[in-house]
C-alpha cells in the first residue's frame, strides 16, 4: 500500500474504535495484531484484543472524541499525535464516575501490512488522565 493508503487506514482506526465498529476491526486488524502499551495490564492481540480494550475504555468513558494534531508517515509506519477527549462516566481504574470531561495527549504508531494494521505502539498521558478524574493527587 502507499503512504497515503497507510495513513488513511491508521486514521480510520480512531472512529472505528470510538464507535466500537467490530466489522471494521475484523476487516482491518490483522489476526496477529499486537498493541504495545505500557499502560495496560492485559494483552491486546488481534480483533478480540481491540474489543477488550474498547470494553475497558468505553466502560469508564463516554462522548469520546479523537482530535488529530499531527500525522507522520514513512514506509509501513504511521505516527498519529492526537488528543483523547471524553467524559468520565463509569468506573475506571477503580475510580467511580466523576462526570469530569478529560483531555489528554496520545501518541500512536501503527505498522501496516497490506490493508491491515499489524502492530501498534501506544503512549497515553495516563498520569494526567488519573489526575483529571481524581484518582491521584494533582
PLM-predicted stretches and their roles:
Residues 1-138:
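C-terminal and inter-domain tail/linker signature
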Amino acid at each position: 500500500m502507499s503512504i497515503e493508503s497507510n495513513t488513511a487506514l491508521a486514521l480510520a482506526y480512531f472512529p472505528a474504535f470510538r464507535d466500537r465498529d467490530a466489522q471494521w476491526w475484523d476487516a482491518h486488524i490483522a489476526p496477529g495484531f499486537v498493541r504495545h502499551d505500557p499502560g495496560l495490564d492485559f494483552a491486546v492481540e488481534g480483533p478480540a484484543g481491540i474489543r477488550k480494550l474498547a470494553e475497558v475504555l468505553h466502560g469508564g468513558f463516554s462522548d469520546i472524541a479523537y482530535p488529530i494534531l499531527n500525522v507522520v508517515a514513512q514506509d509501513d509506519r504511521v505516527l498519529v499525535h492526537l488528543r483523547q477527549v471524553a467524559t468520565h462516566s463509569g468506573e475506571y481504574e477503580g475510580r467511580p464516575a466523576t462526570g469530569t470531561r478529560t483531555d489528554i495527549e496520545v501518541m500512536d504508531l501503527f505498522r501496516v501490512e497490506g490493508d491491515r494494521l499489524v502492530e501498534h505502539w501506544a503512549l497515553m498521558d495516563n498520569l494526567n488522565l488519573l489526575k483529571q478524574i481524581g484518582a491521584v493527587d494533582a
